[in-house]
Amino acid sequence: IKPTWEKLPEDTTEDTLVVELDPGTAFGTGMHHTTRLCITQMKKYLQKGQKLFDVGCGSGILSIIGLMLGAGEAMATDVDPNAVAAAIENAKVNHIDMSKYDVKAGDIITDADFRHTCGDEKYDLVLANILADVIIPLSGVIKDNMKPGALFVSSGIINTKEDAVREALLSNGFEILEVTHSGDWVAFTARK
């Protein structure tokens, strides 16, 4: 992951997956622990051709990497229109096929109509790298967008909120497959 204004390191090989990124005012440079936790889980679980949903997409880094890793299509949403603009621009910089990438501004937690326009029971993998205080209510509604057996990877969770997120996932019927840590941060991988 490199800023658009920097050159590639000389030791970069042809096999290296390079993502160019200009987050603008949106979160997501790829350097934060939570972003790396999500990328690691996505690389582990995403299968070629699967449908990906990036909730709270910020710069679009997770959905862009997902498409570069072989996702068949991706939806990205954020409540901030500036984040949506940044995600679209970053997708273009990385030569993402925009017919496979849809980015929308809206709140899937409070706006059921918006949530349903994003796709009912459509996604194989949902990523949410946002705050625990958002993941907790999100866990109560995101299943509407997930296929049976789909995975939900959530991070942006400070370790002091780990138990609250675990309880929300379990009480909303998720099966927790993995809990990963980096620094003071936590990621959950859960199955619908």
Residue locations for each model-derived region?
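Non-catalytic substrate-recognition/targeting regions of SAM-dependent transferases
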Residues: 1-28
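Short, flexible, glycine/charge-rich loop motifs used to bind or transfer phosphoryl groups or to couple energy/partner
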Residues: 9-10, 42-43, 65, 92, ...
